[in-house]
Design a protein with these regions (language model features):
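Flavin-dependent oxidoreductase catalytic cores
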Residues: 1-329
């Protein structure tokens, strides 16, 4: 059966830095509950998505260092060269169907549990994520990062990005959302610093920008570099310079990543089922991003209708149609 030509736009290739997605269907990062214990099962799981036609297939969060140890919850990691082989299986499986493989590199900051490593969680100002957010994440009292800690975290990100490239990933992420370390630097209620990493919005984005720039310097010649960022809380914060702090953050970082992956803040808002959340539910929060940056933008929104997907692209809301559960169903 031939395809209706009005949907052809959904199958256009999209350039993401030095790599090109073969179409606009993008499986955004999502947890699978699979750890390093079952690499072949994990590879087969992601391969099924690529076989189904997704242009980009992403991992879930990959810890970059033992200071971001999410035990007792299951989690994946890219801590050292021993982890490269298992992720190479996944990349090879994804590539066998012509899709790109994306690695969601992750440091959880104050929200991790560290039940195995026993390392005090890292944070901008020593404030537990559970101080204002109730959820499944850790509630330990975190340490305040000094500038040496900041340099170390950036170095861990770079090392993990290089390992991701060695495994075969085409896109590597910096994660600044959902309560994790980059996001904690962006939010004034968690970032009380008085140095160049705190205070104004311009200072609060500095850590995220440095993470992006260091990652691009390390692997940007061969890998696309994506920023995953939560915008819901920032959109609600007034700014002296823009319509909201979300607008200001995106403007300050507009040229930094090769791809913007934009989302809501927490599971109840970000992951509500389509029977309860209407299509394009995220649009009122993320609709401004493409007006600020020339880089491609991916987002989700309970998409079930190809006509809605086409509309998102033609109206300049998204460049890539993101989904997680549709890639599993």
């Amino acid at each position: 059966m031939s395809r209706n030509p009005r949907y052809d736009i959904l199958f256009d290739p999209v350039k993401i830095g030095p790599v090109t997605a073969p179409n606009r269907f993008y499986q955004v990062p999502h947890a699978s509950g699979m750890t390093e214990a079952n690499p072949r099962v994990r590879a087969a799981f992601r391969e099924t998505k690529a076989e189904g036609g997704w242009g980009v297939v992403s991992t879930g969060a990959l810890s970059i260092h033992p200071s971001s140890d999410d035990s007792p919850l299951p989690y994946a990691r890219l801590w050292d060269k021993n982890d490269i082989r298992s992720h190479a299986l996944c990349c090879d499986a994804i590539h066998s169907h012509g899709a790109l493989a994306a690695a969601e590199l992750w440091h959880g900051g104050a929200s991790v549990m560290n039940r195995t490593s026993r390392i005090a969680p890292y944070s901008p100002s020593g404030i537990s994520w559970a101080a204002t957010h109730v959820g499944f994440m850790g509630n330990l009292r975190p340490r305040v990062m000094d500038k040496k800690d900041i340099r170390e975290v950036i170095a861990w990100q770079v090392a993990a990005a290089k390992r991701a490239r060695s495994a075969g990933f085409d896109i590597v992420y910096i994660y600044a959302g959902m309560g994790y370390l980059g996001y904690e630097f962006l939010l004034e209620e968690y970032n009380h610093r008085s140095d160049e990493y705190g205070g104004s919005v311009k200072n609060r984005v500095r850590f995220v920008r440095e993470m992006i720039e260091a990652t691009k310097d390390a692997v940007g010649d061969t890998c696309g570099v994506a920023l995953r960022i939560s915008l819901e809380e920032l959109r609600g914060k007034p700014s002296n310079n823009q319509s909201s702090e979300a607008h200001e953050v995106v403007e300050l970082l507009s040229d930094a990543p090769d791809l913007w992956d934009v989302k809501m803040d927490s599971s109840p808002t970000d992951c509500g089922a389509s029977r309860f959340r209407q299509e394009c539910a995220h649009e009122p929060i993320i609709d401004f991003v493409k007006k600020v940056t020339d880089k491609p933008v991916v987002g989700v929104g309970r998409f079930t209708s190809p006509d809605t997907m086409v509309s998102q692209i033609k109206r300049g809301v998204l460049d890539l149609i993101g989904g997680a559960r549709p890639s599993i169903a």
